[in-house]
C-alpha cells in the first residue's frame, strides 16, 4: 500500500550563472545551468584598456550574449556573474592588486561591477579554473595555469586555498634556473620565463596558435623549442 514513488530532480534550467574571462586581448563568456552544463559560450577579440570605455564594451557584449532573456528574466533567472582576471585579486575590496598581463596595479573593479544588475564575483583566473573543477572529487589538488603568465591554485580539503595575501598559487616566480633568463618581475630564472605560454614564441611575433601550427607541421625549430619547454615544465612539476 501507500503512495506510489515519485522521481524528484532539479530542473537545471530554473536558474543560470554567467562566467566572464578577461585577458589582455580577448573576452570570453559562458552561461551554465544548475547542473554546471554549458548552455552557451562565446569568445571575442577585445583588447583590455583600463578606462570606462572597456567596462561599457563588456556590458554591451554581455547584454548581447544574454539577448535570449529579457530584463525581467535576467533578474529572476540569472544568479550572478563570475569574472576571472589574470593577476592578484582582492575580492572583498573589488581590487586588482597587481596584474602583469593587464598592466594594472591597485585597480578598482567597482565600475565593472556596476555594469551588471546581478551580484558580481571576481577571481584570479587560476583560482576560477580550480573552482570549475569538481573539488568534491579532488579534495586535495594543485591547478597549474599556463597562459600569458604562469600561475596556479590550491585545493585543500575540497576548498580553495588562496593564502593571507591571495598569492598561494603564484608559482611563476619560484626560481627554476638559477641566474637564468630575466623575468618581468626583475629577478632571473623564474619559472614564468620558461613555462608561461609566451616562452614558446620567445621574441618572435608569432602567436602561440601559430607556434602550435608549426609544431603540427613538424617544423624542426618548433619541435626543439617544444621539447625544451616540456623539460622545464617537468622540472617545475616535479
Regions found by a protein language model. Give the residues of each.
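Adenine-nucleotide phosphate-binding core of ATP-dependent small-molecule kinases
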Residues: 53-71, 191-194, 199-238
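Gly/Thr-rich phosphate-binding beta-strand-loop-beta motif of the actin/hexokinase/Hsp70
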Residues: 4-40, 143-156
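Hydrophobic "anchor" residues
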Residues: 38, 95-96, 160-161
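Hydrophobic alpha-helical segments, especially N-terminal targeting/anchoring helices
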Residues: 32, 89-90, 154, 176
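Glycine-rich phosphate-binding loop and adjoining helix at the ATP-binding site
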Residues: 42-140
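Glycine/GP-enriched mid-protein hinge/lid loop-to-helix segment characteristic of carbohydrate kinases
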Residues: 41-43, 50-51, 110, 117-217
Amino acid at each position: 500500500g501507500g503512495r506510489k514513488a515519485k522521481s524528484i530532480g532539479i530542473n537545471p534550467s530554473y536558474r543560470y550563472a554567467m562566467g566572464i574571462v578577461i585577458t589582455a586581448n580577448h573576452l570570453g563568456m559562458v552561461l551554465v545551468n544548475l547542473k554546471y552544463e554549458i548552455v552557451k559560450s562565446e569568445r571575442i577579440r577585445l583588447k583590455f584598456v583600463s578606462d570606462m570605455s572597456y567596462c561599457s564594451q563588456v556590458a554591451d557584449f554581455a547584454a548581447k550574449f544574454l539577448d535570449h532573456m529579457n530584463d525581467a528574466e535576467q533578474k529572476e533567472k540569472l544568479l550572478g556573474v563570475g569574472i576571472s582576471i589574470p593577476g592578484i585579486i582582492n575580492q572583498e575590496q573589488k581590487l586588482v592588486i597587481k596584474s602583469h598581463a593587464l598592466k594594472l596595479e591597485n585597480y578598482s573593479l567597482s565600475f565593472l561591477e556596476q555594469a551588471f544588475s546581478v551580484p558580481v564575483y571576481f577571481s584570479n583566473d587560476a583560482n576560477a579554473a580550480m573552482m570549475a573543477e569538481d573539488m568534491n572529487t579532488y579534495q586535495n589538488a594543485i591547478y597549474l595555469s599556463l597562459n600569458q603568465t604562469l600561475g596556479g591554485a590550491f585545493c585543500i580539503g575540497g576548498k580553495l586555498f588562496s593564502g593571507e595575501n591571495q598569492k598561494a598559487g603564484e608559482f611563476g616566480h619560484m626560481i627554476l634556473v638559477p641566474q637564468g633568463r630575466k623575468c618581468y618581475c626583475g629577478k632571473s630564472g623564474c619559472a614564468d620565463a620558461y613555462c608561461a605560454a609566451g616562452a614558446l614564441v620567445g621574441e618572435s611575433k608569432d602567436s602561440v596558435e601559430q607556434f602550435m601550427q608549426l609544431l603540427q607541421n613538424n617544423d624542426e625549430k618548433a619541435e626543439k623549442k617544444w621539447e625544451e619547454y616540456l623539460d622545464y615544465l617537468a622540472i617545475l612539476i616535479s
